[in-house]
């Protein structure tokens, strides 16, 4: 029975890639800088001491990081008994965004340039805004700028509730984000507005990767909170991914947990499981691992590393989340049977010690575990698509155009 479990620790980079300078990210290192802060005692809020990741260390995380950047992460166990294969991978795609990273993991790098809204203020074309107001029958709009999602809620959330005007904002990523209150504006209405925005952006040739619904609750600045009802409307990958090939060629199953289905625009997904928060995502993953039959991929995105800690530049929070994931990892490892393979990886970096609030261009870890996987280094992988090619070979699918199998 062949089953693959792919876990994306969203934003968990392990050192700047060779081309990081082009992105202003030379010297970034998500894991390395978190580990250094913990070792210095600068991350003792809600946790304490050096970063403690014994289970990820046994899978080769520390060694992969050392190969990536030349420095072993502070506090991690250098003498851990390695039980998995490990590597670090560079991104071939032109961007450092979520769809690019995930599509490349699934064998389809993004070699074109996304469109971006580069102006910090008045970010969106007036013609686009006018169409959204007209088609969605809006009283107007707020924002129209670059912003962190939590900052803009404190700034404009109360006005949004009073006026019914949605909050439009963007970032350095190829995104059009819409924040609306779940109760005063309505969740279904927000989703409808996002569908309209997706249509207008596509028909208008803007080439924007994602429209993101950002629902929130609360009654005043300071207590607004984004909910788990986020929804991403992505464009479809430009070529068949390993997910689509498994379904088409083997009549296989692909179980999306978290935001995976959104990222691939539902293409190649046979089942969707929603969960919010690391524990809930982990619980859902364990359930689906138990249920998985032959020719199945269970694919989970642990978004909180990125959304709650990376973008918010919260070092103690990121460290505590990693330690939580590591504590629970044995539950996952014991569900890996016989011919199964488990792959732990990331889609980009988001160094919480870095300036700004955006992603960082970094190598990602590739940690592979299974009873038949030979432990040891798999070296430097020139593209995330090596993961996709490895999975394609494992399931005996037609080869992907990009990537080399690691097993």
Swiss-Prot record:
CDD domains membership: PPM
InterPro entries given in the database record: Alkaline_phosphatase_core_sf, DeoB, Metalloenzyme, Phosphopentomutase_DeoB_cap_sf
Binding site for Mn(2+) 1: 10, 347-348
EC number per UniProt: 5.4.2.7
Chief place where the protein resides: cytoplasm
Pathway field: Carbohydrate degradation; 2-deoxy-D-ribose 1-phosphate degradation; D-glyceraldehyde 3-phosphate and acetaldehyde from 2-deoxy-alpha-D-ribose 1-phosphate: step 1/2
A GO BP entry: 2-deoxyribose 1-phosphate catabolic process
Entry's localization field: Cytoplasm
Catalytic activity: 2-deoxy-alpha-D-ribose 1-phosphate = 2-deoxy-D-ribose 5-phosphate; alpha-D-ribose 1-phosphate = D-ribose 5-phosphate
Annotated Pfam families: Metalloenzyme
GO cellular component: a single term: cytosol
Task of the protein: Isomerase that catalyzes the conversion of deoxy-ribose 1-phosphate (dRib-1-P) and ribose 1-phosphate (Rib-1-P) to deoxy-ribose 5-phosphate (dRib-5-P) and ribose 5-phosphate (Rib-5-P), respectively.
Name of the protein this chain belongs to: Phosphopentomutase
Species per Swiss-Prot/TrEMBL record: Photorhabdus laumondii subsp. laumondii (strain DSM 15139 / CIP 105565 / TT01) (Photorhabdus luminescens subsp. laumondii)
């Amino acid at each position: 029975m062949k089953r693959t479990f792919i876990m994306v620790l969203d934003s968990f980079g392990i050192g700047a890639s060779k081309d990081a300078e082009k992105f202003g990210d030379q010297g970034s290192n998500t894991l390395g800088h978190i580990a250094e802060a913990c070792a210095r005692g600068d991350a003792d809020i809600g946790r304490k001491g050096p970063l403690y990741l014994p289970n990820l260390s046994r899978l080769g995380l520390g060694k992969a990081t050392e190969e990536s950047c030349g420095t072993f992460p502070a506090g991690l166990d250098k003498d851990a008994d390695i039980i998995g294969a490990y590597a670090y991978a560079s991104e071939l795609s032109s961007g450092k965004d979520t769809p690019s990273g995930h599509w490349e993991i699934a064998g389809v790098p993004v070699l074109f340039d996304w469109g971006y809204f580069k102006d910090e203020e008045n970010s969106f074309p007036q013609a686009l805004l006018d169409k959204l107001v007209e088609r969605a029958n809006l009283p107007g709009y707020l924002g129209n700028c670059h912003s962190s999602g939590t900052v803009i809620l404190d700034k404009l959330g109360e006005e949004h509730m009073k006026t019914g005007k949605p909050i439009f904002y963007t970032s350095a990523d190829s995104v059009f984000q819409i924040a609306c209150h779940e109760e005063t504006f309505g969740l279904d209405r927000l989703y409808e507005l996002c569908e309209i925005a997706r249509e207008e952006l596509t028909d208008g040739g803007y080439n924007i990767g994602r429209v993101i619904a950002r629902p929130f609750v609360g009654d005043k600045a300071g207590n607004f909170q984004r909910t788990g009802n986020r929804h991403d409307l992505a464009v479809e990958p430009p070529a068949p991914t390993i997910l689509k090939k498994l379904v088409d060629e083997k009549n296989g199953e692909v179980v999306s947990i978290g935001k995976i289905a959104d990222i691939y625009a539902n293409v190649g997904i046979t089942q969707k499981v929603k969960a919010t928060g690391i524990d809930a995502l982990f619980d859902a993953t364990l359930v689906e691992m138990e249920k998985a039959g032959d020719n199945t991929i269970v694919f989970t995105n642990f978004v909180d590393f990125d959304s709650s800690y990376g973008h918010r530049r919260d070092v103690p929070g990121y460290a505590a989340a990693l330690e939580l994931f590591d504590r629970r990892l044995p539950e996952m490892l014991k569900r890996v049977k016989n011919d199964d393979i488990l792959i732990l990886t990331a889609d980009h970096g988001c160094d919480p010690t870095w300036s700004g609030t955006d992603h960082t261009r970094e190598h990602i870890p590739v940690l592979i575990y299974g009873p038949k996987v030979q432990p040891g280094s798999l070296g430097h992988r020139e593209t995330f698509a090596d993961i996709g090619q490895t999975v394609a070979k494992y399931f005996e699918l037609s080869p992907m155009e990009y990537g080399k199998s690691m097993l």
